[in-house]
Amino acid sequence: MNLSRILYPALLLLIALPVAAEDRPFIDEMHPDVNVPDQQPWKEGAINLPPFPQEGDLVEFEVDGAPGQFRYFIDGKNLAIGDDKVVRYTLVIRSDSGANNISFEGMRCDSWEHKVYAYDNGRGEFRRVASPEWERTPKHVQGPHYELHTFYLCIP
């Protein structure tokens, strides 16, 4: 009888040891899958400034909740998706008085980011931004970048 008190726990321990030595997939680090190629980090392509937009090429779009004194356009002739998957476009914001704010921009649909590459220099030409940076596009703030991302340029 004393022997069975010692034998059963010892047998259970011997059975449990190989199970405990197995790989713990949610605890141990995963081994890379050799069948999946390594993903290269994203790299932005070269930027060429487009020609300055012409009035006849502007396509108006609506921005819900925006003040009524502005109208929004993109240059339909120079809208492109690069090999780097960045949508590049010229944005024109026009006030009721006729003043234009013109910028050449890029939008990364997958990461909800946008970047301004150049602005109107006041002489009908683009002036490059010295060090353009990607900015997060707010997902719940009505504005031209949200509208372009959600309803026009990044539709899945």
PLM regions and their residue ranges:
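Short N-terminal alpha-helical targeting/association segments
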Residues: 14-15, 143
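N-terminal signal peptide c-region/cleavage motif recognized by signal peptidases
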Residues: 16-20
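Bacterial N-terminal signal peptides that target proteins for export
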Residues: 1-8
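C-terminal active-site/capping subdomain that shapes the small-molecule cofactor and substrate pocket
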Residues: 11
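N-terminal secretory-pathway/extracellular module detecting exported/lumenal segments
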Residues: 22-156
